[in-house]
Amino acid sequence: MASVLSYESLVHAVAGAVGSVTAMTVFFPLDTARLRLQVDEKRKSKTTHMVLLEIIKEEGLLAPYRGWFPVISSLCCSNFVYFYTFNSLKALWVKGQHSTTGKDLVVGFVAGVVNVLLTTPLWVVNTRLKLQGAKFRNEDIVPTNYKGIIDAFHQIIRDEGISALWNGTFPSLLLVFNPAIQFMFYEGLKRQLLKKRMKLSSLDVFIIGAVAKAIATTVTYPLQTVQSILRFGRHRLNPENRTLGSLRNILYLLHQRVRRFGIMGLYKGLEAKLLQTVLTAALMFLVYEKLTAATFTVMGLKRAHQH
């Protein structure tokens, strides 16, 4: 129990949250482009830079940063929960021994499930706020009018029921394999490099973080597309298809996507997603590693568990 409520776990959680917020702020416009490509499938522009130029031209210079605060708030909470859970469980399970790839995957999966169940309502709200006021090509999208985070929560609960705050939970639970795979490769690659050298450089951490995220994102991207559509929740779908992120709804959306756009329709926006998530993850891990190392050094502590 001491491992779960330890100061070391808190340091990891805060460093992870700060790292993710820093990285997402830097690369936020890329996430805006990715989300538009996923949700507004009738948009003619197919590349990241063309979508961003289109958004700036039609909606203003700051439009790529629309919804920044709710996204950053959600990301901060989400990564705090994930890093805290991941490092607490790892410390509890490993207990001073060397970790393994299998253990990293299991711990990452459990941490992901806890994170999804606690933070999905925040992501549903931030997805809608981020797309509010956007000029869509898809006439099936119903516009929203939220005054802020609290008002968005209020309107969603009032008009759609409290269960709507967990829209996309099922694909999100499937997508816990994304961070689990990411952390498995990250920790595994880090262990391999540390066998050959005493300390990792900033470039080492950046590259390892980028490679781990690229693999995880490519494997799980079709489900991420479905997740974005379900979280947005403003498409005019048939009532029987508007279930709470059920397997039936996921299969329906995947089928519709393939029928209308071919198999590559499942990967629409992947370029923007890879560009954004790979760079964001790499920078996040870099900030995270530097912050944890500096904090442990200043406080005269050793890491709670070995990698």
Curated annotation (Swiss-Prot):
Topological relation to the membrane, as annotated: Multi-pass membrane protein
GO cellular component: cytosol; membrane; peroxisomal membrane; peroxisome
Keywords: Antiport, Cytoplasm, Membrane, Peroxisome, Repeat, Transmembrane, Transmembrane helix, Transport
UniProt note on tissues of expression: Ubiquitous. Expressed in liver.
Domain of life: Eukaryota
Residues spanning the membrane: 10-30, 67-87, 105-125, 161-181, 203-223, 281-301
Pfam families hit by this protein: Mito_carr (PF00153)
Keyword hit for Isomerase: no
Regulation of protein activity: Inhibited by pyridoxal 5'-phosphate and bathophenanthroline.
Record note on domains: The N- and C-terminal portions are exposed to the cytoplasm. Lacks a typical peroxisomal sorting signal. A region between helical transmembrane domains (TM) 4 and 5 and TM1-TM3 or TM4-TM6 are necessary for the peroxisome-targeting activity.
Name of this chain's protein: Peroxisomal membrane protein PMP34
Source species: Homo sapiens (Human)
Encoding gene, per UniProt annotation: SLC25A17
